[in-house]
């Protein structure tokens, strides 16, 4: 996978377990663009103690939700200060509501860097439950396995260290169905928004990761 001279400006949409964490690095590698995960950005701004970070921390410490203005401000700051954004960006975890999508579009339009694509990774809930509830993690290294698709050599044991594997508490089926329900409620309007603006593209993410990658390149018109 070689970097090419094209740039890409896109939003990556998909439920937990759809493979965003697999495909985003592929996109970064292919285009040299920046992967902007809003969760990571928020943590980084708070850790650095930037004005936006200080403001966000105050709100989060009180159990509040960080405002759309702060989130869009963070993305704008990242676009202005992160050299990788010169080759474009892959936004992950944002926008989650129509007002966020509108504010994002407005800010990007003002910069002359509008979104080119909103790619939705589509997977049936049943398959996601099978994928996610089988996930096992080696806590200290972050190595992950899967009971069905990528089992460890010895049951519940890390291949490298022989230490026990754990199943994340939010990876049980009931908790997951709740997350999926709220994801659908939140995301369906966003998908409709991007369909209206004409930049939406859906990809069948139930395929093998390599095939998903090929499909993404196809909808981006880059294959």
Swiss-Prot record:
PROSITE patterns: ADENYLATE_KINASE. GO terms for biological process: ADP biosynthetic process; AMP metabolic process; ATP metabolic process; DNA replication initiation; pre-replicative complex assembly. Its main location: cytoplasm. This is Adenylate kinase. It comes from Vanderwaltozyma polyspora (strain ATCC 22028 / DSM 70294 / BCRC 21397 / CBS 2163 / NBRC 10782 / NRRL Y-8283 / UCD 57-17). Disulfide bonds: none annotated. The gene is ADK1. It comes from the Eukaryota. Residues 134-171 are annotated as: LID. AMP binds at residues 38, 43, 64-66, 93-96, 100, 168, 179. The lineage of its organism: Eukaryota, Fungi, Dikarya, Ascomycota, Saccharomycotina. ATP binds at residues 17-22, 135, 144-145, 207. Consists of three domains, a large central CORE domain and two small peripheral domains, NMPbind and LID, which undergo movements during catalysis. The LID domain closes over the site of phosphoryl transfer upon ATP binding. Assembling and dissambling the active center during each catalytic cycle provides an effective means to prevent ATP hydrolysis.
């Amino acid at each position: 996978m070689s970097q090419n001279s094209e740039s890409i400006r896109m939003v990556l949409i998909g439920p937990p377990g759809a493979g965003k964490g697999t495909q985003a690095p592929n996109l970064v590698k292919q285009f040299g663009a920046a992967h902007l995960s809003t969760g990571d950005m928020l943590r980084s701004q708070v850790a650095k103690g930037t004005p936006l970070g200080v403001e966000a921390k105050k709100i989060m410490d009180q159990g509040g939700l960080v405002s759309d203005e702060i989130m869009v401000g963070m993305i704008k700051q990242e676009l202005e200060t992160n050299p990788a954004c010169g080759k474009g960006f892959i936004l992950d975890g944002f926008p989650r509501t129509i007002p966020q999508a509108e504010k994002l579009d407005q800010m990007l339009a003002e910069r002359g860097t509008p979104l080119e694509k909103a790619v939705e990774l589509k997977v049936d809930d049943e398959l996601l439950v099978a994928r996610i509830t089988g996930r096992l993690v080696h806590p200290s290294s972050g190595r992950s396995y899967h009971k069905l698709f990528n089992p460890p050599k010895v049951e519940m044991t890390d291949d490298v260290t022989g230490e026990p594997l754990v199943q994340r508490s939010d990876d049980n089926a009931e908790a997951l169905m709740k997350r999926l329900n709220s994801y659908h409620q939140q995301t369906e309007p966003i998908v409709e928004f991007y369909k209206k603006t004409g930049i939406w593209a859906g990809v069948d993410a139930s395929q093998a990761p390599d095939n998903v990658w090929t499909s993404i390149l196809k909808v981006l018109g880059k294959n």
